Amino acid sequence: MPASCQHDKNVGRILHEVTYGKATLCDIACEGPVKEKSAFFYFFNTIIISLLSIAFVASLLDYWATSEGKEAELKGRTAWRLLMSFSVPRNTISIFSIRQDPSALQCLDAIRWISFTWVASLHCNMYTADGDNMLQYIRESDYFFSDIFLNSYTSVDTFFLISGLLVSFSFFKLAQVRIFENNSEKTLFRLTPAYILFIGFYIVWTPRMHGVWAIGNVQNSTSFVENCESTWWMNALYINNINGAVDMCYGVSWFLAVDMQLYWIAPIFLLAIFYSCEFSRVYHFRTRVLELILVGIFLSMAAIVFLTAYFDLPVLPVTAKDPGNFEYVNLIYMKPWTRCIPYLAGILCGYLIVQVREKTIVLRKPQTWMILLAWIVAATLALTVVFVVYDYVRGASDWSIATRALYGCFARIGWSIAVGWVILACTFGWAGPISTILSHPLWYPLGRLSYCAFLTHWFLIHLLLDGDDRPAHFVSLWHTYLTLTVPVVFLSFIGAYCWSCLVEIPFGKIE
């Protein structure tokens, strides 16, 4: 209802009477007045204006120094280098450069973009479903290929696998613990300012939108902002996934918390593998790298089985019979002990790539039929993970607790094997045209912007839905993809470019 109904207690009675008693109203949510500007509003906007001013001045001075030939004279000065961290032309070149370290894993940028688009489609579909006709969203589960969207939760595991792979790859490539500690500091200093400042942006500017989406049933931006005002410090410490999904600040931030928590425990496995390799060289015993990874995976599987059995949990957050199971989200979906399977698989992939490149492990190129067989197996695993839940999602079959627990375990293992094979095949030259496509330089800028795109896309979904003059109306999954997901992805990368130039890259250079 519009703001004029804020204090009108007769609205419910009037609507009941005009429908001749046929309408039963559970609740009436009034849009209410726009939130008053607080001291934090002015404080935060002062920070943003200051950053914009510094970037503007730095860009002008960069242009002046380049045109006047002063660059060589100034580049050795610390103050100049700090100021140039905010130069928009330089940061733009850093983002859109198609040059990359030859030792880098070039297929990852494309995989990041594909996974991000899949995640964005998941969120867009969920949020439009939280409108005036959620039953239509549930009916979509009757179509077999709808599982491409309805079971796109696996795309998140791709990000965890990539995170584990990059941590492992950089660690074993450098093979020095001290350098790993320095990289940890760099990671925190590069990611955290962009993250926390965007939380501030969300707190300040979301109430200014305050459209129909501010009073959604589940995805309620008003309550999310209130959560952020009281629990933002948990986001800063990367422990916000302790809160439930309803009480959490900025709905997609749980991923960053879990990713950082897995990053904190990664040294346990990295150091164990590293020192076991060192001892094996000195004392000539076989390194048990795979066994170390399998122990971690087994413990994660045990946690999934226990939680699923004890709390009688489903295998997905949304099904036809259970449109929103927050217990599953809070106990399994947002917790590191269930997400470490793809992360550990990524650590194993990173270790293997480094060892093969350094010729510590010698891999002979498999025969063509073996490579084709591996691709078939990987594709079969990925398709099985996505589509095997078809009957379960649409409510046509009830899975036993054992079946649900096994799917929760082996779906993550199967997906990790499939994605891990794609990365290894592209790296070792076993992917043919697939590697040519995934490793194309045009993917590099999109990969560099994927972090900030992930930060901005959730806010942009709220922005676009709040810009409408009525509640969200779900038509179909493909309709939502074309009318909301595509615009959100496009605008997310525009927003990511701005946020990366203004915050992420400058603070990374300053560190």
Give the ranges of each region predicted by the language model.
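Generic alpha-helical transmembrane segments of integral inner-membrane proteins
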Residues: S53, L60, T117, I196, ...
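Helix-loop boundary elements of multi-pass alpha-helical membrane proteins
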Residues: V57-W113, F169-P193, W264-G296, L348-T380, ...
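Membrane-interfacial alpha-helical segments at the cytosolic side of multi-pass membrane proteins
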Residues: L122-Y127, S163-F172, Y202, L262-C277, ...
